[in-house]
Amino acid sequence: MSDKQQQKHKQKARQARVKAQINRDKARRNLLRQREKLARRRTRNRKQSEPRRDDSDGDDTDGETVKNPAAHSTMPPQKSNAENAVRNSHSTVPKTPKYSDVTARERLYGQRLHQKTAGGNSEASAPSDESASGSPTEDEVNDE
């Protein structure tokens, strides 16, 4: 390969890495946004179902107590995302990707994920997140 071809190859490889980082960050923002929507939907559903549950008080339509043991959950009821964040507070994913020269983003799970989504909307925190990680912007990709 000539020097010109090598330079072109290196430039394309660099652009591919930058594009992959941008796509990763977009997917991450979308996941955080989806998580916020899911939390809002859960609270809305919980508000709708609690009055119905209080009205039934474990009785079926005939006034008899339901005796189905499969209908009882052994898991504690989910009251908030904070409770779930504490329950799922470990990760088996390595901190840095194997065989990769791309800088890894901070893993979001457990309390960090809850704080990230509860601390405000994901769009407001996303620009500061990207500048801290050193991930290039779309304009930087187009300049290369």
From Swiss-Prot:
Induction per the UniProt record: Part of a gvpF1-gvpG1-gvpH1-gvpI1-gvpJ1-gvpK1-gvpL1-gvpM1 operon, maximally expressed in early to mid log phase. Gas vesicles appear earlier when grown in static culture, possibly due to O(2)-limitation.
Compositional bias per record (Polar residues), positions renumbered to this chain: 75-94
Gene Ontology CC terms, in alphabetical order: gas vesicle
Keyword Chaperone: no
Region (Disordered): 1-144
Consequence of gene loss (knockout): A single deletion produces no gas vesicles, in situ. Deletion of gvpG1-gvpH1-gvpI1 prevents gas vesicle formation, cells still express gvpA1. A single deletion makes gas vesicles as long as the cell that sometime distort its shape. Complemention restores wild-type gas vesicles, in H.volcanii.
Subcellular compartments: Gas vesicle
Identification of the protein by name: Gas vesicle protein I1
The species this protein was found in: Halobacterium salinarum (strain ATCC 700922 / JCM 11081 / NRC-1)
Gene giving rise to this polypeptide: gvpI11
